[in-house]
C-alpha cells in the first residue's frame, strides 16, 4: 500500500491518503513537542519506537475486543489504518494524580485514584485543549450521547487491559489519553497509544518513563521509551 497525498501534519505524526479511500498511512516522525507545540525537538529513533509501540498496544487492545483503526505495520515509522471520522474530543483516564489535575486542584502528585477519574478535553491546541463534559458534547454536537457513552466504556475497558499489561512489566499506568472516531457508524479507537500520550512510572522507583522527561527537561527521553518497550516485549530492531 503506497502513501499518496499528505492530508494532515500534526505535532508528531503525518497522515497520508492511499489508493483505497477507506485506508490511510500514519507516519510517526522524530518530532517531540510540549506546550501545545510551542516547543519542538527531534530525537533519533523516536518515530520508529512510537510506531512499533503503538502497533503493539493496539494489537493487545484489539485482542481484548476493543475495535481499533489499526490494519498493519508498513515500515519502521509507518502503519496502515482505517480512515475514521474523528471525534473532536479526547478521553483521559487517571489512575493517579499527575499533570494538569495536580495543578488544577492543588493536590499532591502520585495519589492513587479509586475509582479512576474520567475526563474529556476538546482537541484545540490554540485554546490549550480546554476541559469539557458530556453536556458540552451534546449541546455543541461534537459527539452523540450514545457514541460518547461507548467511548467512555471502551476507555475504561482499555484502562483495565493496559493497567495489568504495564503492571506485569513493572510499570504504573498513571494516566493516558485516547481518541476515537467513527468507521461506518461504529465507534473505533484511533490516533495512537505511546509514551507521548500517557504517563508511565517505574513501579519501584517511581521514575518517570514518558514524555514528562521532555516536558520537565529530565533528559533520557528515548532511553526511557525504549526501556518501556523492552519491558513490554515490543520488538524494536
UniProtKB/Swiss-Prot annotation:
E.C. number: 6.3.2.6
InterPro entries in UniProt: SAICAR_synt/ADE2_N, SAICAR_synt_PurC, SAICAR_synth, SAICAR_synthetase, SAICAR_synthetase_CS
Any GO BP: cobalamin biosynthetic process
A Pfam short name: SAICAR_synt
Catalysed reactions listed for this entry: 5-amino-1-(5-phospho-D-ribosyl)imidazole-4-carboxylate + L-aspartate + ATP = (2S)-2-[5-amino-1-(5-phospho-beta-D-ribosyl)imidazole-4-carboxamido]succinate + ADP + phosphate + 2 H(+)
Pathway(s) it belongs to: Purine metabolism; IMP biosynthesis via de novo pathway; 5-amino-1-(5-phospho-D-ribosyl)imidazole-4-carboxamide from 5-amino-1-(5-phospho-D-ribosyl)imidazole-4-carboxylate: step 1/2
Segments crossing the lipid bilayer: none
GO cellular component, one term: cytosol
Key words, A-Z: ATP-binding, Ligase, Nucleotide-binding, Purine biosynthesis
Catalytic class of the enzyme: ligase
UniProt GO MF annotations: ATP binding; phosphoribosylaminoimidazolesuccinocarboxamide synthase activity
UniProt keyword Nucleotidyltransferase present: no
Database matches in HAMAP family: SAICAR_synth
Family: Belongs to the SAICAR synthetase family.
Name of the protein in question: Phosphoribosylaminoimidazole-succinocarboxamide synthase
Amino acid at each position: 500500500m503506497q502513501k499518496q497525498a499528505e492530508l494532515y501534519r500534526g505535532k508528531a505524526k503525518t497522515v497520508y491518503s492511499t489508493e483505497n479511500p477507506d485506508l490511510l498511512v500514519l507516519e510517526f516522525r522524530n518530532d517531540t513537542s510540549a506546550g501545545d507545540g510551542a516547543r519542538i525537538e527531534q530525537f533519533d529513533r523516536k518515530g520508529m519506537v512510537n510506531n512499533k509501540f503503538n502497533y503493539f498496544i493496539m494489537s493487545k487492545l484489539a485482542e481484548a475486543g476493543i475495535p481499533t483503526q489499526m490494519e498493519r505495520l508498513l515500515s519502521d515509522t509507518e502503519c496502515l489504518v482505517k480512515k475514521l471520522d474523528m471525534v473532536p474530543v479526547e478521553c483521559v483516564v487517571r489512575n493517579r494524580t499527575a499533570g494538569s489535575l495536580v495543578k488544577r486542584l492543588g493536590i499532591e502528585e502520585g495519589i492513587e485514584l479509586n475509582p479512576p477519574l474520567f475526563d474529556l478535553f476538546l482537541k484545540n491546541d490554540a485554546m490549550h485543549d480546554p476541559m469539557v463534559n458530556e453536556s458540552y458534547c451534546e449541546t455543541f454536537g461534537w459527539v452523540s450521547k450514545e457514541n460518547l457513552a461507548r467511548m467512555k466504556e471502551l476507555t475504561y475497558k482499555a484502562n483495565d487491559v493496559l493497567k495489568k499489561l504495564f503492571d506485569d512489566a513493572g510499570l504504573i499506568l498513571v494516566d493516558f489519553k485516547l481518541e476515537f472516531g467513527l468507521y461506518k457508524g461504529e465507534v473505533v479507537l484511533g490516533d495512537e497509544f505511546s509514551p507521548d500520550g500517557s504517563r508511565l512510572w517505574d513501579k519501584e522507583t517511581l521514575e518517570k518513563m514518558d514524555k514528562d522527561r521532555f516536558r520537565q527537561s529530565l533528559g533520557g527521553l528515548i532511553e526511557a521509551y525504549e526501556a518501556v518497550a523492552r519491558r513490554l516485549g515490543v520488538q524494536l530492531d
